[in-house]
């Protein structure tokens, strides 16, 4: 990829899943146009908007006004913000709101928020009336480049993260890049971890481009739109090849096995660790573990660590505030990972930058020894 110098321009990424194909629109001003974009694609004229207490005061009125202008009747539900909202209790609250609004199969549930709202709303949309239409309006960088695309929905339980859910593809994704201007630096950095992930999976040129252009991505404009579009295209390619995560789609979990265990270890307390930060630490650990297994050069892990550290992300377990439980407890969380098959641990490892692969024969003893070595005791 070359340096981006042109003015911001809207981008469209098509996810070609046959009859369930959908568009991802990326650019400024999309919330104001949401009603028109939805009306041209969906037959229904009712929508239930699900959002949270942080997003609602900023964007809910603009979205509902846009829906009204397009002739779409809407209701809204405002939920508490944070990872703990991804629960059975709140899932039932969303389902009740959707049914109370008499949303039918051709009508839509609209997720206005970050990954938590998208995952929760998508789950409800997938099970109410055995499936209603679903529109994602992601308001964080992380949700724009990752969780809003691909149809994975779910909630957390005390057993772990995202262990209960369904696949339910959206009918449209509206990634309004203007909303990113209201994110805190911490939130934006957390989303950037998922952007970098796509380069580390199988696009080394993209990772190198990010190393050279990350400041322009952070400052906005054309480079930001280009990075989001490239990320969405990368995810679309993987989803189309393996929609149900039976094979190569597991690559999208690079850094997530370690990251999810760290999130569980912090009780999903966003004051200590948010998802993207867990992924950043997890990606560094995945590269270091690959080096430990003589699969990759230690220089690759150092390069990943250096870039993520440069943009301000945590890269070590010791960067997480407060005490962590022992390595054995982290190991228990890893054993609950949804990629575990027949009791065998499955990790996304790497042979170098952009050379990730699925390893389903990783010895538990090696993982535990590695965690003990990296644990900030």
Curated annotation (Swiss-Prot):
Q: Which Gene3D superfamilies match?
A: 3.40.50.1970, Dehydroquinate synthase-like - alpha domain
Query: What is the gene name?
Result: aroB
User: Which reactions does this protein catalyse?
Assistant: 7-phospho-2-dehydro-3-deoxy-D-arabino-heptonate = 3-dehydroquinate + phosphate
Q: What InterPro entries is this protein classified in?
A: Dehydroquinate_synthase (IPR050071), DHQ_synth_AroB (IPR016037), DHQ_synth_fam (IPR030963), DHQS/DOIS_N (IPR030960), DHQS_C (IPR056179)
Q: What are its E.C. numbers?
A: 4.2.3.4
Q: Which keywords has UniProt assigned to this entry?
A: Amino-acid biosynthesis, Aromatic amino acid biosynthesis, Cobalt, Cytoplasm, Lyase, Metal-binding, NAD, Nucleotide-binding, Zinc
In the record, biological process GO terms are: amino acid biosynthetic process; aromatic amino acid family biosynthetic process; chorismate biosynthetic process
GO MF assignments: 3-dehydroquinate synthase activity; metal ion binding; nucleotide binding
Cite the binding residues for Zn(2+). 194, 256, 275
What does the entry's cofactor note say about binding and number?
Answer: Binds 1 divalent metal cation per subunit. Can use either Co(2+) or Zn(2+).
Q: What is this protein called?
A: 3-dehydroquinate synthase
User: What the protein does?
Assistant: Catalyzes the conversion of 3-deoxy-D-arabino-heptulosonate 7-phosphate (DAHP) to dehydroquinate (DHQ).
Superkingdom: Bacteria
NCBIfam families reported for this sequence: aroB
Q: What's the cofactor? A: Co(2+); Zn(2+); NAD(+)
Pathway as given in its UniProt record: Metabolic intermediate biosynthesis; chorismate biosynthesis; chorismate from D-erythrose 4-phosphate and phosphoenolpyruvate: step 2/7
Family the entry assigns:
Belongs to the sugar phosphate cyclases superfamily. Dehydroquinate synthase family.
GO cellular-component terms in the record?
Answer: cytoplasm
An example of a Pfam family matching this protein is: DHQ_synthase
Compartments (UniProt record): Cytoplasm
Q: Where does NAD(+) bind?
A: 115-119, 139-140, 152, 161
